[in-house]
Regions:
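Intrinsically disordered, low-complexity regulatory segments
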Residues: 1-141, 149, 218, 439-442
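Basic, low-complexity terminal or inter-domain segments flanking catalytic cores
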Residues: 2-5, 16-17, 25, 75, ...
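Conserved short loop/turn motifs at secondary-structure junctions
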Residues: 3, 82-83, 159-163, 243-252, ...
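C-terminal or mid-to-C-terminal helical accessory/interaction module adjacent to the motor/catalytic core
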Residues: 113-195, 244
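Metal- or metallocofactor-binding catalytic centers and their adjacent structured scaffolds
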Residues: 215-254, 434
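Short acidic, hydrophobic short linear motifs in intrinsically disordered regions
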Residues: 241, 250-263, 289-297, 450-462
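Short, hydrophobic-biased segments on the C-terminal half of alpha helices
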Residues: 275-279, 478-479
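A short, conserved structural fragment
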Residues: 282-296, 484-493
């Protein structure tokens, strides 16, 4: 068969899937950008107010470029990179190396990788969007100048190995500011009075005499005790019973941020992991009808759904669940995200007939979990409202008013697809005028809590709300902060590290624009304006980069150094036996290193006191039997063998003293996402729940 088409996509997985749909086409993957700014220099020339980038074919793309040039000789070329600014730029660079008129190349786009979508795209090609290319190039140059000009100053004035970035530094400030809020928070003690009436029904206090009871209003213990005594001695009667019906609409289909948030909350996945899994589902997996993409493009801030998709979703709801579960009218969701690209679709499944049951048989476990989230949200968004009857019983005493609330699900609607259904709270059959007996009144002492630390879900949500970054950069930005050791996690909570705090405080003091969320958001708006053709790259870059470069050059001499000077030890390096050992300060504290670096890379880890085997806190090494030591790493605490470097055992969790009851091997003492402790054998890996001490939850009794 003669191949007369060359389709150039970004990823090999996508190429593999598309090649099964088109018989007369060669499909090649560019594997991302074939040209980029080389890493060995800033590679941006500023001349007469113009910013001129110098691109090179990256070393690992030279063979791919040769293949593209060879295959393009006698074929019609279709540029089929992703439909976003990065994809548009990738297509532009490919067209550039192919030569000729850039405007002569056909550009095809699709939001799902199915045969019908690819054929439709081939029938409706367009030309490269040069405004989108210019917006991407502006972002690339901007980030290069910030990174290559500001980062050396940061390393010179703050510490080795640090870096600054336009988006990453603004996000780092969010985490740092939250840490400051928590540090200065002063807790306030307050009291609550949970009430139980006869038949074990919980009730709450509405008012006492003239005092309206609100959360945290009782901060005097004697006052709370007096009210408690008043309730216990009061006589109560039902004075009002109301039942109000309420409708609850389903949530819209997923976009990038809401998918990342749902996967973080429900599955415990980091945004980068969610996007990696979603990428595979988009590019193509095996299904009962062959290999295809099973979700639409996953980097989107749109809530739009294609007309054909809505029809198939609604038909599936009708056949699977019946007419009563289908919304009366088609649900259309409005985009509230600033700069949302309406041409894109929301994230949805491409084929509603590839059901959750099918997916469980064909997909890997982690892929299945993400697909299930997307499938259910795809269906829910066109289902009928859930109907709830909320019941309130108002009960008056001589000095106190209390209330009892209940709930009855009249119709589950879209909540039918939730893993955890809304449960009824059925109340006894109360009558107006009937007497109510108080069964118990507790006095609970509580304290106000500081603002919650960010987790992946809440940080992504805040980035979106403030306009910091774009859907394609959220996950990568968070991963970067973690990988560089500026932020660490404990469970889901994000903590600023000493290094991250020091860096953020420095940037906030000397380069406030870099870390200001409003400034960063405004820059994203300017990039959107370039993409719309309302302004140009040189105007935007000139207004920002020239003053920044001048400020950095001035800072090289004017900003005092915050770096801790090396301390001399008088000891000779045991490795090179030439230079003196010095004490340096790194991310995790002080350490000894050779002053001859980088010629000699000797490092001496700080000595940690080793406990006795009989009284060790973190268990014994399962490999050699030596005591485990707790250390602080760039990703948080970990446990390693005190016999290092002879034994290189490391573990995220300490080793339990109790051995596995199944095989007698060593076990890790782990903590679940909810903070509960469990044991995990290193050999057979069964999970053994830890026995809990029975403690009363009641206070003040």
């Amino acid at each position: 068969m003669k191949y007369d088409k060359l389709i150039i996509v970004e990823s090999p997985a996508k190429a593999k899937t598309i090649s099964k749909f088109i018989d007369n086409a060669v499909v090649i993957a560019s594997k991302g950008h074939i040209r980029d700014l080389p890493v060995y220099s800033i590679s941006v020339k500023i001349e007469d107010g113009k910013f001129i980038p110098r691109y090179e074919i990256t070393p690992d793309h030279k063979k791919i470029v040769e293949d593209i040039l060879h295959e393009a000789k006698d074929k019609k070329v279709y540029l089929a990179s992703d439909e976003d600014r990065e994809g548009e730029a990738i297509g532009y660079h490919i067209a550039t190396i192919l030569g000729g008129d850039i405007g002569s190349y056909d550009r095809i786009v699709f939001h799902e990788i199915t045969k019908s979508a690819i054929l439709k795209a081939l029938e409706n090609p367009r030309k490269l969007n040069m405004h989108a290319v210019e917006a991407q190039e502006t972002r690339r140059i901007l980030d290069r100048i910030v990174g290559y000009k500001l980062s050396p100053l940061v390393r010179k004035k703050v510490d080795y190995g640090l870096s600054a970035g336009r988006v990453q530094s603004a996000v780092l400030k969010l985490v740092n500011d939250r840490e400051k809020e928590i540090a200065k928070f002063i807790p306030v003690t307050y009291y609550e009075l949970p009430i139980t009436v006869r038949t074990d029904t919980p009730a709450s206090l509405v008012s006492h005499k003239e005092l309206k009871i609100t959360k945290q209003c009782l901060q005097d213990k004697q006052q709370a005790l007096a009210i408690k005594a008043s309730i216990e001695s009061d006589k109560f009667k039902v004075v009002d019973i109301t039942a109000k019906k309420a409708s609850y609409k389903p949530q819209p289909p997923f976009k990038t941020t809401t998918l990342q948030q749902a996967a973080s909350t429900e599955l415990g996945y980091e945004p980068s992991k969610t996007m990696s899994i979603a990428q595979k589902l988009y590019e193509g997996v095996e299904t009962p009808t062959g290999r295809k993409g099973v979700i639409t493009y996953m980097r989107t801030d749109s809530l739009n759904l294609a007309k054909e998709a809505i029809e198939s979703i609604r038909n599936k709801i009708l056949t699977m669940h019946g007419k009563e579960y289908l919304s009366d009218a088609v649900r259309i969701y409005e985009n509230k995200t600033k700069g949302a690209q309406e041409a894109h679709e929301a994230i949805r499944v491409t084929d509603v007939n590839f059901t959750i049951e099918d997916a469980k048989r064909y997909l890997e476990p982690e892929q299945f979990k993400v697909y299930k989230l997307i499938y259910n949200r795809t269906m829910m968004c066109q289902m009928s409202d859930s109907q709830i009857e909320n019941q309130t019983v108002l009960i008056n005493g001589t000095e106190n008013v209390i209330k009892i609330t209940g709930r009855k699900v009249l119709f589950d609607g879209w909540t039918k697809l939730k893993d955890k259904a809304t449960e009824d709270i059925i109340l006894p059959n109360y009558q107006i005028g009937s007497t109510i007996e108080i069964q118990a009144v507790q006095l609970d002492e509580k304290q106000t809590e500081p603002p919650a630390r960010y987790n992946s879900a809440s940080l992504v949500k805040t980035m979106e709300e403030l306009g910091i970054g774009r859907p394609s950069t959220y996950a990568a930005t968070i991963a970067l902060l973690l990988n560089k050791g500026y932020v660490r996690t404990e469970g889901k909570a994000m903590y600023i590290t000493d290094t991250g705090s020091k860096l953020s405080n420095f940037l906030e003091e000397y380069f406030p624009d870099i870390v200001d969320d409003k400034f960063t958001s405004n820059m994203e708006t300017k990039l959107d304006e370039i993409a719309l053709g309302n302004t140009d790259m040189h105007t935007v870059l000139g207004s920002y980069c020239i003053p920044l470069i001048e400020k950095i050059e001035k800072g090289n001499t004017d900003i005092p150094s915050l770096r801790v000077p090396d301390k001399r030890t008088g000891e000779t390096c045991p490795s090179c036996k030439e230079h003196e050992l010095v004490i340096k300060t790194g991310r995790n504290g002080e350490f000894k290193a050779c002053s001859g670096y980088p010629k000699c890379k000797y490092i001496e880890r700080p000595k940690v006191p080793v406990e006795s085997k009989e009284n060790c806190s973190y268990g014994l090494c399962p490999d050699c039997g030596e005591v485990l030591i707790k250390r602080d790493g760039r990703f948080g605490p970990y446990y390693s063998c005190s016999g290092y470097p002879k034994c290189k055992f490391m573990s995220k969790w300490p080793i339990a003293k109790e051995k596995c009851p199944t095989c007698g091997n060593w076990q890790q003492e782990c903590a679940s996402k909810t903070g509960e402790t469990y044991y995990r054998c290193l050999k057979c890996k069964p999970i053994q729940p830890r026995k809990k001490d029975k403690k009363s939850k009641k206070k003040g009794q």
